[in-house]
Amino acid sequence: MLVATIFVLVGLVLLIWSADRFVYGASSIARNLNISPMIIGLTIVAMGSSAPEIMVSATAAWQGRLDTAVGNALGSNITNILLVIGATALLKPIAVASMTIKREFPLLILVTLLGYLFLADQSLTRAEGALFLGGFVLFLVLMVYWGKHAPPDDPLLTEYQAELPPPTPTWQATVWLVLGLALLLASSQLLVHGAVTIASHFGMSDLLIGLTIIAIGTSLPELAASLIGILKGEDDLALGNIIGSNIFNILAVLGVGTIIAPGVIDAAAAGRDSYVMMAATLALLLMSLRLGKLRRINRVEGCILLMAFIGYQYLLFSS
C-alpha cells in the first residue's frame, strides 16, 4: 500500500510537470516555425491543462480499463465544477460578464449532453469515439475562428497568449518536447498502476478509482489556475479555464479512451455519474445567468457547490 501510494503521488507530480514541459516545447517549436502566437495559444496551450487527463485515459484504456478512463473524464468534470469553482467562489465571488462565457457556455451544455447521450446505452463504440474526437477538432477550429474575429483585448486571446513561453532555441524546445512526452507516458503508467493497486486493496471498482483519486489528482492544475486567477482579478481566467477543460475532457479524454478500448461501461457511469455531471453543469449555468442577466457566482453558491462535492464523494464510497 505504501509503495502504491508513493506511485500515485509521484505519478501525479510528474504528470503535471511533464504536461507543462511538453506544452512548453511544442509551443516553442511552433513559434520558431512562425506559426501565429494566437493559433498556438488557442490550440497547444489550451490543451495543456487537459493533457494529464488525456494521457491517463489513454493509458487506462490501453490496459483494458475503459471504466477508469470514463471515470477520469466524468470525475474531472464533476470535480472542476463542484470543487474547483466552489472553492474559487468561496475565496472570492466570480464575475460572469464576458463574451468568452457567452460563447463557451452553450458549447459546454451541448457537449455535456452529447456525452450523456453516448453513455446512456452503457457502452461506447469506436464510431462514438471518432465523433468525440471530430468534435474536438471542430472545437479547436472554432476557437481559432473566434480568436481571429475577436478584439485585441478579448479574454479568450489574452488568457492563452499570456501563457506562451519566451523565445527558446529549437534544440532546447525539442528536448523539452521529447522529455515531456516520455515523462507523460511514464508518469501516467505510474499513476494508473498505483491507483489500481490501491483500488484492489480496498475492493474499489475501476470506475470508482477514476472518479476519485485520478479525477481529483488531475484536476489540481485547474484548481491552482482558478485560485490564482481569481486572486489576480482575472475572473474570466478562473471560470473560462474550467469551461474549456470540461469541453476538452468529454471530447478528447472520452474520445481517446473510446477509440483505444471501446466496450461496455459500468452502469453507474451511464446513470448516477452522468446525471451528476449534467446536474453540476446546469447548476453552474443557473448560477452564472439569472433571467438572461449576467451576474456573479457568490460565496453562498460556492459553499453549495462544495457541499455537493462532499455529498457526491460520500455517495460514491457508501454505494
Curated annotation (Swiss-Prot):
This is Putative antiporter CaxA. Disulfide bonds: none annotated. The gene is caxA. It comes from Alkalimonas amylolytica. The chain crosses the membrane at residues 3-23, 38-58, 81-101, 105-125, 127-147, 175-195, 208-228, 250-270, 275-292, 297-317. Signal peptide: none annotated. One of its GO terms (molecular function) is calcium channel activity. GO terms for cellular component: plasma membrane. Keywords: Antiport, Cell membrane, Membrane, Transmembrane, Transmembrane helix, Transport. It comes from the Bacteria. Confers modest Ca(2+) and Na(+) resistance. The lineage of its organism: Bacteria, Pseudomonadati, Pseudomonadota, Gammaproteobacteria, Alkalimonas. GO terms for biological process: intracellular calcium ion homeostasis.
